[in-house]
Amino acid sequence: MSALTVGTATVSTSLVAGTNTYPNNQGNDNDVLTTNGSGTLTWSAPAGGGGGKETIVNSSSAISGTLNLDFESAQIYHYTANAGGNWTVNFRGSSSVTLNNTMDTNQSLTFVLYSQQGSTAYYNNGWQIDGSGKTPKWLGGFGTPNSGHTNSVDVYTYTIMKIGNNDFRIYANQNFYT
C-alpha cells in the first residue's frame, strides 16, 4: 500500500497511530520529540550537545589540592586566581553521583580546565575518576607534563571514554595562553 495524504488533521487529545502515541500540541521553541522506548512521543528540551553553548564554572579560587570536576555542573572550568599549588583532578558526576553512574559504556565526554598561573607556575599532577587514581595518555608523545607556564593561563583538555563498568580511558592535553 502506498502512503495516503489526507491534509491537515486537528487532534484535541493524543493521537495514536499504530503503536505510537503522538503529543497533541506543538511543544515550545527548540523542543525536540523524545520517546520513552515504548512508542509514546513527547516534547522536551534537547539534552546535551545542542545549541552550541556550554555552561561554565567561573571561579576566583586558587587551584591546589584535589579539584572535583562535576559533569552535572559543567564541563568547562575557569579559575581566575593564580594556582596555589599542584593539584589532582577528580572527575565525577556530582558530589552524590559517580561518573560511572552518569555515563553509559561507549560514551565519552570532555572537560576543559583553565588555570591562571602567576610568577610561580603549578600544574595538574594527579588524576582520578570517582576518587580512584587514573593515568591519562598525553597528546604529543611527550609524556605527563611536569610544570605549568609562568604568567599565563594553562589549559587542560581531558577526554574521558567509558569502555566498561568502572573502566575509563583519559586522553589529555596541556597548552597555555600568554
Feature locations, PLM:
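Short, Lys/Arg-rich amphipathic alpha-helical interaction segments
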Residues: 168-170
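Extracellular beta-solenoid/beta-roll
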Residues: 49-78
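Extracellular repetitive beta-rich solenoid segments
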Residues: 1-50, 71-73, 80-87, 91-110, ...
